[in-house]
Amino acid sequence: DIMNAASSSPAKRRPLVLVSWNGLDTPWAMIHLDATPEFDWVLFDYSGRAQTQEVKWRDQTAQVLSGATECKGEIYQALGSWLSTSITPQTHLPEYIGLLDDDIVIGVSDLNRVLHLARVEGLDVFSPVLTHDSRYTHRWSLQQPHRLFRDVDWVEVMMPFYKGQVFIAASPFFKDFVSSWGFDKYLFPMIQKAIKFIMFRLLLL
């Protein structure tokens, strides 16, 4: 059940950050590789061209996952399935799990920083904010001056980060969802209430 899924692996390993990739262009094309990542990379090839394997590209070590997808819901499914088979008593659950769209411009140092801030604050679900010249759907996802954190009701699926227990507890509900519609506003808040993790925040870089 949800409670057991959330508590089955209390030990943690490094955070995991998945970045979407079209399988053809330069991996991490929008990511500024300006620091050593304090997390593990997953590259998800949504064209299905690449082989599932561990690679070292651009001096970055990454696990490649691959599958022809239509929408982000299938990426959630694929990551959840891979984690369910790769987590062992020796490897444990990632501390945090992030999923970034391939058009997000951000640096490795930024990702290190948001993970550090989330750890310090004990956040359960969070996201970096968008600059005001970004394309956006929700105005509340934009930067605000002189603020480091901002509580919100839910975090959009564009570049969310989840505590490992939250993601794993939600993963059975990803099944057969092509779209991720409703994951952000409904599924993850429901999961958090069920396992008593209730903190949503935006990190204002």
What are these regions (language model features)?
Residues 1-5, 10-15, 177-205:
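C-terminal catalytic/acceptor-binding lobe
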Residues 92-105:
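Short beta-strand-to-loop acidic/aromatic patch adjacent to the donor-nucleotide binding site
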Residues 42-95:
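Active-site-proximal specificity loops/subdomain of glycosyltransferases
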Residues 43, 99, 125-128, 197-202:
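A structural signal for short, well-ordered beta-strand segments and their strand-loop junctions
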Residues 47-49, 129-134, 203-205:
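Short beta-alpha junction loops
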